[in-house]
Amino acid sequence: FYAVTDHAMFLGAVKAAADTTTEFSRLGHVQALHNLNAPENQNFDSIPDRVTAFSTFLPDTLAKVGDGSLDPDVVNQIAKDAWSDTIRAAETFNDPGNFTTFVAYEFTSSTDDRGNLHRNVIFQGADRLPAMPFSRFHSQNPEGLWDWMDGLRQNGIEALAIPHNSNGSNGQMFKLVDWASDPVDDAWARKRIRNEPLVEVTQVKGTSETHPLLSDADEWADFEIMPYRIATTLESEPKGSYAREALLDGLTLAEAGITNAYQFGLVGATDTHVGASSLEEENFFSKVGLLDADGERRGSVPMAPAEAEVIRAAGRVNVQEIAGREYATGAYETWSASGLTGVWAEENTREALYAALRRKEVFATSGPRIKIRLFAGNDYAKDDSLAERYAKGVPMGAELHGADGRAPILVASALRDPSSAALQRLQIIKGWVADGETNEQVYDVACSDGGQVDPETHRCPDNGARVDISDCSITENVGASNLEVIWQDPDHNPEHRAFYYARALENPTCRWSTWDAVKAGVEPRPDLKKTLQERAWSSPIWVMPQS
């Protein structure tokens, strides 16, 4: 399934500026866009002019709307026409049972200090839709988006919003205060979770599950960390920017008698701006076309002096000497070949997929098509069928009640992507509140190659999987095709409010930056990680306290 989520702010405006038959294209400040994609302009030397054309387009257009020299109705009509094109494309290619397409867009607000507040907005159907999408032009405040969505829902138009790139929000995505900096109340919490039942945890601009500074006991927390605010090299504050901490903060809201605003499911996305998914480490092509189309431009391979001069002139990224060689530096080298959303649904239709998104029976992966699943119940048996797992308990995304003091029984499973590395381990991540304090614990629950979890450390033994950095080959015949376990929390306390989600890890493989270096015949850049462990995350299950 697929959703095209174009930016709502100035939707269609660049295309209209490049089309010389439009009234908009005759404005002086858009002339540089006219032939931008002519073959002679699609080369390395064009980068400075391209960067200038795009970086000046937005402020110049806003200025002309502000001073009255550009009628805002012209911009609005362009957006309406582009929105109609988006709807038409989704309708044309929707093929129930085979390929599902959703009408969607991206709400692209941010704080004044560049903290990212972007949301992907997905519509359930296409029969009745607004004339144009709600954008930052309408409100910088995401609460305005929720009000707009509530209004649509009252008129029979159903949609949900998915916060994404929270890692670049500078602590703003998952605050415990509202836009006016007042403590959140129940009405605010209900409105948020009603409109935002999902959160994106991985994409091309890094992974937002958790951060080493927030989860120092999780050895796998330092995974594809993109440390910057979006479109800058300003550091982003981790606290308030990552999903696991938000899940924990949601428990504290519930403990205080407020609706859990952060009782969300986990999904992934690509967020590339090139109309395609760059998901394979070996074949990574990044996100912004000419600016990061090869290893030199995205900082994984040393730059030749002439190329370094062009990059310096563009001003988009820096050039830095590292270990005696010049590399492009900025944010590109921290980006990722990620991610995907998986949905457990009865059929491949808009109705079934959207219902699964709403009930949070969804999962995220960092690129590979790993399938992960989680159930929780009070009376599961080892040989239960899938139907019995649903009948006796709940799937991921749901709440579990009524354990009568017993630890819930969790059934977790993961199936490898046959085109990717084998699975190394299956984990359960638990979060809970005790005595007003939030806590988290990572449990290995299933190990590859016959390994047994150490009951003291809750860790699998090393399965011996290694990577040869010289050619990116990996250890053969190590790892599992599938892992499945029935597990009970050895530290369960029936009085604690808790969540559990599953995480599956592949054997180590080369990161895209190492692949770039191998193909170029150079040593990998020394300050970048050489390998990674691709992974999948289930949505959580929330276990309610007995009291």
Give the predicted meaning of each segment:
Residues 1-17, 22, 72-75, 87-97, ...:
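C-terminal functional module detector
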Residues 1-157, 161-177:
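A metal-dependent hydrolase metal-coordination microenvironment
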